[in-house]
A protein has these predicted regions:
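Short intrinsically disordered terminal tails
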Residues: 1-3, 106-110
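Alpha-helix boundary/N-cap detector
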Residues: 3-14, 18, 86-100
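Generic low-complexity, intrinsically disordered sequence content enriched
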Residues: 10, 21-23, 39, 46, ...
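Amphipathic alpha-helical segments
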Residues: 10-32
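Acidic, low-complexity, intrinsically disordered interaction modules
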Residues: 31-100
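Charged phosphate-binding loop/patch that engages nucleotide di/tri-phosphates or the phosphate backbone
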Residues: 101-105
Length: 110
């Protein structure tokens, strides 16, 4: 198995990265805000590697946009004692759908 395949599989199991991959496939873009400084670290991006870097470095607000509509705004705390914390401020159906699919997949893997 290739190293790149293993990396993708590991990222798939991380909730915050899985969320980004899921919504990128749906044609969404992301804005990332650093909670510490309040600054926008990434705006209107669909570049997975740049989004991953921005949300892996610190606690962030992640805005998910589709066709100029705010799908949701989530609070991301990566690697919170080994478990990603994702809080959906908008309680959106789209995030609920992703969450249900992600939880079912993780149950099947364990």
């Amino acid at each position: 198995m290739k190293i790149e395949t293993l990396k993708k599989a590991e990222e798939f199991k991380q909730g915050h990265l899985n969320l980004v991959q899921y919504f990128l496939k749906k044609g969404c873009k992301f804005t990332v805000k650093d909670l510490g400084s309040g600054a926008v670290s990434l705006a209107n991006s669909s570049n997975y590697e740049r989004i991953k870097k921005a949300i892996n470095e610190y606690d962030t607000h992640l805005e998910i946009w589709k066709d100029d509509r705010l799908v949701s705004k989530v609070w991301i705390i990566p690697y919170n004692e080994g478990i990603d914390t994702i809080a959906d401020y908008y309680v959106s159906k789209e995030i609920d759908d992703w969450s249900n699919k992600f939880e079912k997949t993780m149950e099947q893997l364990n």
